[in-house]
Every structure is written in structure tokens, then in C-alpha cells.
């Protein structure tokens, strides 16, 4: 409610942010099924608290026009899964500082750290949110203890939120219960 209208002339790096609101129970209803409004006072930023802070932003870095934030789905365990592309250029072999990306403003604005200016290789950096599937607690936005790189001392750190890494452009996800393990050797 406090954001201004998008500026179509804005060409700089920014972040992907996930915000949660509580729906308002419709008058005379006992369920939220037909809810059409939210309580703005319930706003909670799960990911991307600030555009930039030192040493860097808490959001998914967006340095190019594609391969950005993809899907949100809930796992069967209630966790929130978020897909995010590497946000590297699709028109060149982006190993960092690609001319058609906004890497320079991302560094200046604290959206990227210098070690993250590696283009598509961000997907391999456990301390970057780019090129990942993130697994979050849907109430707090913290990483989940069973995530592979979780740190109890830093539950909001990028590594604590990483569920899978090394992904170029995971722009769509779905949960298909009963489809089995993801291990190929199990044959299902």
C-alpha cells in the first residue's frame, strides 16, 4: 500500500521480495474461502527485508530481465518453496560483468557482493539466493532446519534457506504427491 507506481524508465538492479499478509475474514463467513481483502497491518516480509543493507540485500538479486523469481509452492510438510533463476544474461555467456546486465548498480546498491558478480555461476554459490530452490518457514521466512546448508546461528542467511542449487531458470514448480523419491536409482 505504500509503494509508488512502477517507473517504466527504471533500469537498475533490484530484488525479488516475498511478503505475507493475513486475509480479512469476510463478514458473516466462517472460512476465508471468499476473502478478497487483506489486513495491511499484518504485513510480514519473509524474504527481501530491505533493498540493500550491509553487507548485502536479503532479497533475490535481479540483475537482468529474465531468469529471476519463478514460483511459490507449499510442500506437503507446510514449508514454502521458492524457485529463483541465476538472473544471468540469456544473450551472452555471462560469467560476470555482462554488458547487458545491471551488475554495476547491483554492486553499488548492495544487492550483490563482489564474489557474486559471476553471472550464471551464482547458481553454484551457496551464499547467493540466485539459481536456487529455497525452502522457508512460511511464518518467519527463516530457513528450515532440515535444509542441507542450514545454520542454527544464521537461520535467515542465504545458505540456511537453500534447498537445491545450480539451477539456470527454475521458473515453474509443482508438487505432485505420490510420485516417489527424486533419486533416479530408485526407479520411480
Feature names for model-found ranges:
Residues 1-188:
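Surface loops at the rim/top face of extracytoplasmic beta-rich domains
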